[in-house]
Amino acid sequence: MCGIVGFTGNHQAAPILLDGLSKLEYRGYDSAGLAVRDGEHLSQVVKAKGRLSNLSEKTDSGKALKGTCGIGHTRWATHGEPSQVNAHPHVSGNCEKSGSGTVESEVVGVHNGIIENYTELKEKLLKHGYTFYSDTDTEVVIKLVDYYYKKYNLGPIDASAKTMVRVRGSYALELMFKDYPGEIWVARKDSPMIIGIADGETYVASDVPAILKYTRNVYYIGNLEFAKLTPGEAHFYDLNGDEIEKETTEIKWDAEAAEKAGFEHFMMKEIYEQPKAIRDTLNSVVKDGVIDFTDIDLTEEEIKKYSQIYIVACGSAWHVGVEAQYVIEEMAQIPVRVELASEFRYREMPLVKDGLVIVISQSGETADTLAAMRMAKEKGLATLAVVNVIGSSIAREADKVFYTLAGPEISVATTKGYSAQLVALDCIAVQFAKVKGLITDEQYSYYISELQTIPDKIEKILQDKERIQWFAAKYANAHDVFFVGRGVDYAVCLEGSLKLKEISYIHSEAYAAGELKHGTISLIEDNILVIGVLTQSKLYEKTVSNMMECKSRGAYLMGVTNYGNYEMEDKVDFTVYVPKVDEHFMGSLAVIPLQLLGYYVSVAKGLDVDKPRNLAKSVTVE
């Protein structure tokens, strides 16, 4: 949530900053701003409410701001309403123009995160003569830096360190000091930040896509660390002011993967990239026909000792966990608990000491998931992270990491990230079953080969997208939609429902089909859309029966089922068929039509598919 960028080098900064912010729009925002400095001249600050295009227009696409050092920000309101006044950057001076224009301030900065004790700090600063023009916690932090900088006559190192010790909460902070032209100072705690290095130029961003166009060599700044950035160099420090040695990491992602490549929206592009994401993820662990977790550092001895698995995640990643629970418990005969990270971290619950906590996060920065993992580690449990971003906070702190190879995912609504996570958990299920002696060599090979057929079968489903597009246009004005299924199909329904509601703004809910009669069926009325997922042969007739109850009350029925279940045509009003794969893995196929449905409904309604209202791609605050 929020996005930060920074640049110091030889080129004009503002166009680079605007380009970087455009690559972070998926994180969600309500306003944006830039601060650019030309040599020893004072910083120029420009801010705008609303879309990034408003800021671009104000600055003539950045050409109106001269200077080779600058910082930028897209804001998601947490303290103070969305407005130009509350937009970042903020300044340390007592400014009457909401911090815009040429600023006579010692410190200019932007911040991503939440400062929990900002009220206390604000009262302190008021007593020392500071006044405030905004309602934000960020202005408080900038003025706290200024306070230490001036009062103790400190340099940026000590002023930054004292500020970091004093504040409570999360932050990724960028600062420019009037007395230090060409330098950007950054600090981090629990909010994402990467630093990119190229020839004579240095970049800062919340996420990789913002700088991928310019460099692949990045530094990861650790918790409670700060850094001085100059053109082409970065120097890191701990809270004591001692310098820390770091090495760069090369980002392997293709720069073009962060572009639309001819698709109207990132979401559709990423739907089409799912076969590759799954192939790449499978190929990273399937070698010579067997699953090899050597790179994850997960040994057979460790697998044998785990008696309980906890899967902890948020949003779509939690849906992956729900589906994986069915597969792992049936295959590997290990009890699995699936927990929402935002609940798990606050529960006083007994945890099995020889349990394994699997945390799932596409970004590797999800605040609640990160906090839940830390809690599990404090209690002595082993942790395995399934993440997509190399070097992310969760990846760095987990005991073991299974990287999904989905590449950058820009659309807020996850598709390929979800699918890569799901196949990763399927691999874990198969390997655990094999190591525990619960499946034969023949079954093991069969399951692996079935997983390897999924990419081609997804491509076949995508060939039928026009029928789903037609159906989506027909129901684009629906007010309520219900998804029903059992077992793995229920998990698919959870994800399908979320896809529809988050990008089309239609109220939708997913229910275990057997629960309809326990209250939900009272909501069924004429022409309400009920979507059933029916891929599990043992549960097929039960779910059909539940759907018929809905039809008898006037519902319009859509069914998603396997090729071969052609009697479905006589029972529901619209049927989507998907290829067959082993039923443990059917969720990877059944979810595709539901992704397409959500996408096409949103398009039919003329909505912003990639950046739905009120949502952020990476939820990095609690």
Predicted features by range, described:
Residues 7-10, 111, 131, 135, ...:
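Hydrophobic alpha-helical scaffolding
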Residues 1-260, 264-265, 276-307, 346, ...:
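Conserved short alpha-helical segments that host acidic/polar catalytic motifs at enzyme active sites
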Residues 304-446, 450-453, 533-579, 597, ...:
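Glycine-rich phosphate-binding loops that contact phosphosugars or nucleotide phosphates
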Residues 274-278, 282-310, 400-529, 602-622:
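Active-site phosphate/pyrophosphate-binding segments
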